[in-house]
Swiss-Prot record:
Organism whose genome encodes this protein: Rattus norvegicus (Rat)
A biological process term (GO) from this entry: protein deubiquitination
Name assigned to this protein: Keratinocyte differentiation factor 1
Domain of life assignment: Eukaryota
Gene coding for it: Kdf1
Biased composition (Pro residues): 1-16
Length: 397
């Protein structure tokens, strides 16, 4: 029984004042059972991810969620925190792979929803950034940068730029099969151009020598192991031997020494007409051009002049000229030595007999003969002319 003066209770639910009305009230029944709001979930980053060093909260922004109809305002599932949880559930399955590879989905789900595979440039940019002032570690570099490091180590520490070109030719070409194959955009795939032949002396009828250094000629005959100039032709050594024989037939050793002194001047070609004739004969006989014939002739002259121990072969013309020469009267010895063809290569020396003229000439020279007395220097005794002792020059003051 209610007390008098109190309002009579109604059979329905009690009415509450505006200050006692609950903030959320829903009388609708849903098939899905409302779940309590989950706690804040954290996910540790993948150890392969170099950009994150600690746990991060998973927050997803849906890029493909269908806009639903406006739900009743009393449903707890459509509150802000509930909608965030639903978006995370929808996006988690599609972003799971991206979470393991690039770690970009922990901030935004849009990169993984738009493209399935991570972009290589983004991974390199993320690797190049410093994290908390610490430079990036090379152990966690992306695959493209690791391949570049392997390429640099294979080339060596002294050269680390494989795409450098000099006049269009790559400086470091890929010559070995063990070298890594360059990519399509690399400029190292071009092969080196073959250098032009440096030998200009021989005509095109002869094949080029594999040695390629015939210009640097040796002065010793033992080093003349030059290859053949062509099939069926004379070798370079045989040509030099024939030039040597022609030089020794035309000139004496002394004349060859004199020619060797002027080989660097144009006087060599103007020295005698025999040189020009010899050059023309070498050019015609051995099918060489004039420049090569001159070079071989100069080398032969220098070789003969620098080899003093080699004996000069005597020709038949020299022997016949000496045998037919008339017997000359004994002289002071100068003509005899010149006529004998004495040279430094020959060891035999011929000396003529001393005449009275030689003895008088030796006495005229002071201290000329060994043991000559000093008292006879001014008297000149034993000569055919007498001297009065007067001075030959008179000085007038």
């Amino acid at each position: 029984m209610p007390r008098p003066g109190q309002p009579r209770p109604s059979s329905g639910p009690p009415r509450l004042g505006p200050w006692e009305r609950p903030t959320e009230l829903c009388l609708e029944t849903n098939d899905e059972r409302s779940q309590p709001p989950p706690g804040r979930r954290t996910r540790r980053p993948d150890p392969k991810d170099p950009g994150h060093h600690g746990p991060e909260s998973i927050t997803f922004i849906s890029g493909s969620a269908e806009p639903a109809n406006e739900p009743p305002t009393c449903c707890l599932l459509w509150r802000p925190w509930g909608w965030d949880w639903c978006r995370a559930a929808f996006c988690f399955r599609r972003c799971r792979d991206c979470l393991q590879r690039c770690g970009a989905c922990v901030r935004s789900c849009s990169p993984c929803l738009s493209a399935g595979d991570p972009i290589e440039g983004s991974s390199e940019a993320a690797w190049a950034k410093e994290h908390n002032g610490v430079p990036p570690s090379p152990d966690r570099a992306p695959p493209s940068r690791r391949d570049g490091q392997k390429l640099k180590t294979s080339m060596g520490s002294s050269f680390s730029y494989p795409d450098v070109k000099l006049k269009g030719i790559p400086v470091y070409p890929y010559r070995h099969a063990t070298s890594p194959v360059p990519d399509a955009d690399s400029c190292c795939k071009e092969p080196l151009a073959d250098p032009p032949p440096t030998r200009h002396s021989l005509p095109s009828t002869f094949t080029s020598s594999p040695r390629g250094s015939e210009e640097y000629y040796s002065f010793h005959e033992s080093d003349l192991d030059l290859p053949e100039m062509g099939s069926g032709s004379m070798s370079s050594r045989e040509i030099d031997v024939l030039i040597f024989k022609k030089l020794t037939e035309l000139f004496s050793v002394h004349q060859i020494d004199e020619l060797a002194k002027c080989t660097s001047d144009t006087v060599f070609l103007e020295k005698t007409s025999k040189i020009s004739d010899l050059i023309s004969s070498i050019t015609q006989d051995y099918h060489l051009d004039e420049q090569d014939a001159e070079g071989r002739l100069v080398r032969g002259i220098i070789r003969i002049s620098t080899r003093k121990s080699r004996s000069r072969p005597q020709t038949s013309e020299g022997r016949s000229a000496r045998s037919t020469a008339p017997a000359a009267a004994p002289d002071s010895g100068h003509e005899t030595m010149v006529g004998s063809g004495l040279s430094q290569d020959e060891l035999t020396v011929q000396i003529s007999q001393e005449t009275t003229a030689d003895a008088i000439a030796r006495k005229l020279r002071p201290y000329g003969a060994p043991g000559y007395p000093a008292s006879q220097d001014s008297s000149f005794q034993g000569t055919d002319t007498d001297s009065s002792g007067a001075p030959l020059l008179q000085v007038y003051c």
